[in-house]
Amino acid sequence: MWGINKLNPSEPSVKVPYKESGHMIRGNNVEILTLAENAAFVYWVTGEEKFARFATDIFNVWLVGTYYMNPILDPEKSCGSVGGWEPGGICGYYDYEQIHDDLVMHAAMAYDFAFDYLIRHPHAHLKAIGKDTKTVAAEVFKRFINIGLVRGGKSGNWNVNGWNIMLRPMLVLDHNEAYADGKGKEYYLNLLVNESTPYHDAIPDILKTYDRVT
């Protein structure tokens, strides 16, 4: 991104590497998506479409942009893997750390609360490429989930925070039979509620490490 000297804005802009600006960019995007989330909730409560329209304008831009993203690469393995879709390490789909992939949390909530309006008002680009909002949203949400399931930490704080990122997009998916790969909300929720994986403990194993004293 281009950085501006606040003390002297007339100075030429300076290109700032993502590794030095990433959290700031993500923070700005979280702030914007939170506005969409809040507006969608107000629409759900009141039925006033002006709030749904506001949320949809934000969500649709995020959705289309994210649809064309690939997971970040880390050829030097500073995060524990080469990135992309390779299991292991801590990289998220969007952020350097999976536990900071919180854009999807706010996007999923906006999607859920303004769902009916979003479906009726797809982004123009989706119509141009012959896709609908529901299909693209599911694909994008599942990317965040699938990356989260093979990244982060198996136990402790990392594990719980990783599930926190993944839970909301899981809940807005349809049932298993809606998807060609058979992976809908039931499939993913089973991994949280019942079945631990090599990368994340499920709730029964989380409780085994819970210290009732401290």
Task: Identify the residue ranges that each predicted region occupies.
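Aromatic-lined, polymer-binding surfaces characteristic
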Residues: I25-T214
